[in-house]
Amino acid sequence: DLDAWLTGDAGVLAESLLTMGITGMKMWPFDGAAYRTSGTSISPAELDAAMRPFRRVREVVGDRMDLMVELHGLWQVPAALQIAQAFEREDIRPFWIEDPVRPDDIAALARFAHGTRLPTTASELLGNRGGFRELLEARAASYVMLDLGWCGGITEGKAIATLAESFGLPIAPHDCTGPVTWAAGCHLSINAPNTLIQEVVRAFYTGWYTELVTGLPMVSDGHVTVAPVPGHGVALLPGLADRPDAVVRRTGVM
């Protein structure tokens, strides 16, 4: 799916996702420009090239697909706002812009959020409810993205979801850190009344996740269903540690 929009046809990818009932897709074609300048600037040619996949989706499927813009926290505020302004000028209507600047710089994130009409999402990279509280108090995000593998686990994630709800904001649990984290995130999504969307990386869900575990939540017609079993429902495949390509790390308390 990454290659489909990076070097192929993002419109065809959007059509493929829609056949599964998936109505939102995230793309990050701006990263190369950020690496070139350390996020300080983006040239007109780079900006135009990065906008093309988004234009293509709108051309092929219209408004049937929500478009999320991922910036991976790579930009300084002026360049991030330049990107946002490009979307504001065109009839693309992104659902959100995610992590436009470093998420640990709440002041910079707030300057961005207050400088654009587009919704801002942040951030799976924050490590506990304290960071999210600062984010929310600064009014620096419209949507709250969290990753249970990075924010402190299920208990901390639930506290963050409740905190976001108290500010009137929805959450969107992140997927990219493995099948167990994703399954736990699905359970949080079902539990939290302010869940907007549960992210899933289709290539992972249909690929290497299935090589590691059983009991993954089911994705059907754009919705997630978890198994009616105790816990998160995921179990490692038998013999996984014995695979020739497996790397086993053991930790313990002496």
Where do the model's predicted regions map?
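Metal-dependent enolase-superfamily TIM-barrel catalytic cores that perform enediolate-based chemistry
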Residues: 1-110, 115
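Catalytic cores of large soluble enzymes that bind and process phosphate-bearing ligands
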Residues: 5, 45-49, 152, 177, ...
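Shared catalytic-loop signature of beta/alpha-barrel
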Residues: 85, 92, 96, 102-227
